[in-house]
Amino acid sequence: TSSYNPQNQWTNSYGAIQYINLFLEHVGGVKWSDDEELNKLFAQRLTGEAYGLRGMFYFYLLRAHAGFGANGELLGVPIFTEPQTIESDFNQPRASFQACVEQIYNDLSEAEKRLPYEYEDVSGSVPSDFQSLTQDVGKYNTVMGAKARQLYNGIIARAFRTRTAVLAASPFFEDASNAATWADAANAAAAVIDYKGGLSGLASDGVEYYSPTIINTIKDGANPNEILWRGNKGSGDNDQESQNFPPSLYGNGYMNPSQNLVDIFPMANGYPINDAASGYDANNPYAGRDPRLGKYIFYNGSTISEKSITININEGNQDGVNVTENRSTRTGYYMRKRLRMDVNCNPASISKQPHYTPRIRYTEMYLNYAEAANEAWGPKNANGRDYSAYDVIKAIRKRAGIGGTNDAYLEACAASKDKMRELIRNERRLELCFEGFRFWDLRRWKADLNEPVYGISWNGNSYQKITVEERSYEDYMYCCPIPNSEILKYSNLIQNKGWK
């Protein structure tokens, strides 16, 4: 209901925007340093960060609450660019979807022109965009150098421009009032990819960006090659593992991947498992599969060399289906992605390891480009660039170790925009699984929300597909509601169609 929405962004995002608007009102009057050049540099960076963060929070609001109102119009959210006071008129209508997109772009542009792509120390001379503020390399590095790593920067702003453009061009938001195009979305993603170095910038170790080797060698706020923006690297914990390890590893098994997800991982030869050319064996369902399956999901027979253990979902086994309430899998699978196998949750010998949260991966940017470019120009039309949608998907699949020297299934898909769309969406689903994208992707694509959730059971001799949960969604649920408490308070707010 509109009174209970776990995806609600209204309170937190508008609260953040209020603080940002207050900051922007006062930033010019604050003395950040006794040195005039440092003062100007700090003011520019902090102003740029504030604009970028405001654009980010408006993106979260738009993604969560935009939709077709009860009046039939495609609506966004109310826009506030100045701080509200007790004398402000809070009874503001929702701006159009188009106006919200433009506001996000404007904020991101203000960030982009004030911030470097990344915060790194320079030698020699100050970058040309900042020479009007200082010619002193030391002063530039004090404010815009490596000490500011992981703060909001220019490439983060461009990544949110890409996310906004893909959202706005998506099928759910098609409307005469919406000027977004897939070409705009492709160009926005290409700006990030070009900065990364084109196809050659796709991180070779991006499939397991969370591996102990990568995490343990992160230093001083730097990013792994796959990561555009991340959270801090902690000193050590086992929270994710304790929550998601199977019971045999002393975990609580919270996240249970569905059979639906497992089935979309192709065979190592690149063919889907339902293709006659795949070689898939239902009696040995995990043999010869896409290597990402074993890296992202614990399945029956998964081995963990660090712990000398094999996952066994046989009926009655502690890792079996529904053996222990709230701990055992409901689907026959457990999540493995982002978990460290060198963590021990055994109460007798607990060990912890550092982790970090990936806020934005470069692979997402490549997938955004592939989706948008295919829709705008088709699978193989690069529109003047060195890479097409086809080229990006080929590189991602090759990195994963599927398709061999001749990815015949990819080549077949490249002859059709519709087939390539299906393949791109499939690659997006498995590459970004467990990272918070699927919920939003299904809605912006207007995809089927009522597919039953399937799992698998194993009796020691054969596998049996099981129905875990039936889904019941109405069409109006493609968008999330405006909080009912806000609708009751403000007469100018229009609820999204269908929500009560």
Language model: regions and residue ranges:
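An aromatic- and glycine-enriched ligand-binding surface/loop that stacks and positions planar moieties
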Residues: T1, T47, L61-V77, V101, ...
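Conserved, well-structured interaction surfaces
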Residues: T1-G67, T85-D121, A287, R336-P358, ...
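Long, intrinsically disordered, low-complexity segments
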Residues: S13-A16, S88, F97-Q98, Q103-Y105, ...
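Short helix/loop segment immediately N-terminal to the Walker
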Residues: V30-A43, P116-A148, E174-A176
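Inter-helical turn/loop segments and adjacent helix faces that build the functional surface
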Residues: D34, A168-S177, A376-N383
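C-terminal substrate/ligand-recognition segments
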Residues: Y286, P291-I396
